[in-house]
């Protein structure tokens, strides 16, 4: 049974979700948000890095799924998002984690069944799949969805003898 970390990166709020992959599906372990406040970008990135590292050290996941950068409303937002992703990826890499990237469409498809799902639909399916009794924060819900997507990807690869998710194209090899 594998512990999986999902990360929904952001320069102000980074969501995290930890699930345990079992033969019967995913089981909820933990979720939350790393809030950086309104400081300088370098300080906020350091908070993201330290927060992700703390989650990894607290729960001990061995693999991480993280959302890919999408084209934001403006280029500056996309750059900041990419930098927050980088901080989270470095935290995982330093802990020796296997890291995989997923587009928002891939995550929605894996959790809801359609890549056009909205955030509320994703949140409701995450609650249903993990048997949660209350709504997680939206960023934490997105991170749990990423973890579930990563679990589905891993389980679809393992029966074919391909090993871990890093064997597929588009994965980070660190």
Swiss-Prot record:
Q: Which catalysed reactions does the entry list for this protein?
A: Endonucleolytic cleavage at a junction such as a reciprocal single-stranded crossover between two homologous DNA duplexes (Holliday junction)
Q: Which domain of life is it from?
A: Bacteria
Alphabetically sorted, this entry's keywords are: Cytoplasm, DNA damage, DNA recombination, DNA repair, DNA-binding, Endonuclease, Hydrolase, Magnesium, Metal-binding, Nuclease
Q: In which residues is Mg(2+) 2 bound?
A: 67
User: According to its UniProt record, which cofactors does this protein need?
Assistant: Mg(2+)
**UniProt binding sites for Mg(2+) 1:** 8, 139
Q: Name one Pfam family in it.
A: RuvC
Q: Name one GO molecular function term.
A: DNA binding
Q: Which HAMAP family match?
A: RuvC
Report quaternary structure and partners.
Homodimer which binds Holliday junction (HJ) DNA. The HJ becomes 2-fold symmetrical on binding to RuvC with unstacked arms; it has a different conformation from HJ DNA in complex with RuvA. In the full resolvosome a probable DNA-RuvA(4)-RuvB(12)-RuvC(2) complex forms which resolves the HJ.
Regarding protein family, the annotation reads: Belongs to the RuvC family.
Purpose of the protein? The RuvA-RuvB-RuvC complex processes Holliday junction (HJ) DNA during genetic recombination and DNA repair. Endonuclease that resolves HJ intermediates. Cleaves cruciform DNA by making single-stranded nicks across the HJ at symmetrical positions within the homologous arms, yielding a 5'-phosphate and a 3'-hydroxyl group; requires a central core of homology in the junction. The consensus cleavage sequence is 5'-(A/T)TT(C/G)-3'. Cleavage occurs on the 3'-side of the TT dinucleotide at the point of strand exchange.
Q: Give the protein's recorded name.
A: Crossover junction endodeoxyribonuclease RuvC
Q: Which organism is it from?
A: Pseudomonas fluorescens (strain SBW25)
């Amino acid at each position: 049974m594998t512990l999986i970390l999902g990360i929904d990166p952001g320069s102000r709020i980074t969501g995290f979700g930890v699930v345990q992959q079992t033969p019967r599906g995913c089981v909820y372990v933990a979720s939350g948000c790393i809030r950086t406040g309104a400081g300088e970008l370098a300080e906020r990135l350091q908070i993201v890095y330290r927060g992700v590292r703390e989650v990894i050290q607290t729960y001990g996941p061995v693999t991480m799924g993280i959302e890919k950068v999408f084209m934001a409303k403006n280029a500056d937002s996309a750059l900041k998002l990419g930098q927050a992703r980088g901080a989270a990826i470095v935290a995982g890499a330093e802990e020796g984690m296997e890291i995989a990237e997923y587009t928002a469409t891939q995550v929605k498809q894996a959790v809801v069944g359609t890549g056009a799902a909205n955030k509320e639909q994703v949140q409701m399916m995450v609650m249903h799949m993990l048997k949660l009794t209350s709504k997680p924060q939206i960023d934490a819900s997105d991170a749990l969805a990423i973890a579930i997507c990563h679990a589905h990807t891993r389980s679809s690869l393992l029966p074919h003898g391909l090993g871990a998710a890093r064997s597929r194209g588009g994965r980070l090899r660190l």
